[in-house]
Amino acid sequence: TAKAIAAFKDKQEYLTDFVRNKKSPRVENPIKIIAIPTTSGTSSELTCWATIWDKEKNNKLSLAHKSLYAEKAIIDPSIMVDKPLGLTISTGLDALSHSMESIWNINANPVSASHAIQASKLVLENLPLLTKDLRNVELRSNIALACVHAGLAFSNTKTAIAHNLSYPVTLNYGIQHGIACSFTLPMITKSMVGIDS
């Protein structure tokens, strides 16, 4: 990803070492990141993670480092209106997965829960409408806001079981990430309702 490249700048061998040997990453003088997302789902513009899909070894790696927080995030829903239906659904479900996993997460706290609940509501209210009106900037704005709330939520908690279960589905069957995450959400949510740690 661009964030990983920015972190390692001219030391790409450190990135290769991280991917191939899972050695702790050495980050020296990273490039400052200005993130302009073109979809609403990953929240990478708000988090300290970079995702690397190693298709050769059939593995997904997450690189976490404070330098991976964007210096600035510019969120402009008007540049998202040309995204196709499948991508819109997948990225929206990724934001929903981030938020719901933050609600039941062992690391949840009042701040993360507040953001997660707001994100979940926004996705559930707006994504079905957006699938019927893809060029609607107001609906895109609401999903972008949901993504911001979800990013702030899971930045505090990290993701949980739905994401962990999704990686083999994406790697082995080519199912888009957000769709793969969403398969297990109903079952996991049902098992979590009423449980309070």
What are the residue ranges of the model-derived segments?
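Carboxylate- and glycine-rich phosphate/diphosphate-binding segment that chelates Mg2+/Mn2+
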Residues: 49-157
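Short, well-ordered alpha-helices that flank and scaffold nucleotide-derived cofactor binding pockets
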Residues: 3, 7-11, 156, 167, ...
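Glycine-rich phosphate/pyrophosphate-binding beta-alpha loops
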Residues: 41, 148-181
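Glycine/threonine-rich beta-strand-loop-alpha-helix active-site module
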Residues: 1-78
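Beta-strand segments within the central parallel beta-sheet cores of soluble alpha/beta enzyme folds
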Residues: 17-20, 141-142, 182-184
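Gly/Pro-rich interdomain helix-loop hinge
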Residues: 171-197
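A general structural signal for well-ordered alpha-helical segments in protein cores
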Residues: 2, 93, 120, 162, ...
